[in-house]
A protein has these predicted regions:
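A conserved acidic beta->alpha catalytic loop
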Residues: 42-52
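Short beta-strand-to-loop acidic/aromatic patch adjacent to the donor-nucleotide binding site
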Residues: 91-102
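Short beta-strand-to-loop element that shapes/binds the nucleotide-sugar donor at the catalytic cleft/hinge
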Residues: 126-141
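A recurrent flexible, glycine/aromatic-enriched loop bordering the glycosyltransferase active site
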Residues: 156-177, 243-246
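Non-catalytic, C-terminal membrane-associated alpha-helical segments of glycosyltransferases
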Residues: 232-311
């Protein structure tokens, strides 16, 4: 592992994006300057001056700012960055990096160690998932996980424990993909709209026999920006027409992505997800009551002041 392409996409989060890039550079300078980094970041229609602010900063590694259409969402922006990195060529791997993370210095020690561990124990390189924590509370937010129930997709998150752990899939907040994995799987599926493709890619790599490892220590700080109840309280109060719109919205329930993920990863789930997707919109409270029970949530109350976690 010598040359790494860092893949990013951004949309109107200038301060967070600059903080992310600064933390990336600071940790790299302290611990592992032997690695060559090249940043490929898609500016997906930013109107807050993100691109110009990046150009005005002084970075010791090259930063390639790519123009997006403004409608790429996360998946499209990352594909745009990944294609540019592949076109340049010569990289040993690719680091998916969300622009709202603050990279910790331990990451630069754990990352090359993962490469060595993988080679020694599996005879090939793989995917290395970085875990993130809330900067204020220290709570585990994103990382690797296993599917406990493949029907409901209930998962068990695996916090870092000081050793390398294997997992079935992972979040893409700060995750490294070795070149040999890309040669086999290609890059992200371009049919996804917004999120979900990180779970798809890591799970398919796992199914293809590539090691998917969780790094031993926290790799970054990142707040969980998903609502605890998945937006259900607001969803319940919407009229039917708006619930159907939200069902298909890339920033809503995104039925398109749910169906695509099922078709690619668990094909037998496809008809179930298609039917339950519309049941969710037609009879939301009944659907979620059954759904939460299936996921092992015993106390179910629909008090508007109560949150219900899907995790």
């Amino acid at each position: 592992m010598n040359r790494i392409a860092v893949l990013m996409t951004c949309h109107n989060r200038k301060d967070k994006t600059l903080r992310c890039l600064s933390s990336l550079q600071d940790g790299w300078r302290i611990t592992n300057r032997e690695l060559f980094l090249s940043i490929f970041i898609t500016d997906d229609g930013c109107t807050d001056g993100t691109a110009q602010a990046i150009r005005e900063q002084s970075f010791t590694f090259p930063v390639h700012i790519l123009q997006g259409s403004g409608n790429l969402y996360w998946n499209g922006g990352m594909i745009n960055s990944w294609k540019a990195a592949r076109a340049e060529g010569g990289f040993d791997g690719y680091l998916w990096l969300n622009d709202d993370v603050v990279v910790l210095s331990e990451f630069w020690t754990d990352l090359p160690a993962a490469d060595i561990f993988c080679q020694e124990n599996y005879g090939k390189k793989g995917i290395y998932v970085g875990s993130t924590k809330d900067a204020d509370t220290g709570a585990f937010t994103y990382g690797g996980f296993n599917y406990v129930n493949k029907l409901t997709l209930k998962d068990q998150l695996l916090p870092p424990n000081g050793s390398f752990q294997t997992c079935e899939a992972g979040h893409g907040n700060i995750t490294y993909v070795s070149e040999n994995v890309v040669n086999h799987l290609g890059i992200f599926c371009d049919k996804y709209i917004h999120g979900g493709t990180d779970h798809d890619y890591t799970y398919l790599a796992h199914k293809a026999g590539f090691p998917v490892l969780i790094l031993p220590h926290y790799a970054a700080a990142c707040r969980n920006d998903h609502s605890k109840d998945g937006g259900r309280k607001n969803f319940f109060s919407l009229p039917l027409r708006e619930r159907l719109h939200y069902l298909h919205s890339p920033l809503g329930l995104n039925l398109h992505n749910a169906l695509l993920f099922s078709r690619r990863c668990f094909p037998w789930r496809y008809p179930i997800i298609l039917i339950t997707g519309y049941l969710k919109a037609l009879f939301p409270k009944t659907y979620y009551r059954c759904y939460l029970r299936a996921r092992g949530v015993k106390q179910i109350s629909w008090d508007p002041n109560t949150n219900h976690s899907c995790s």
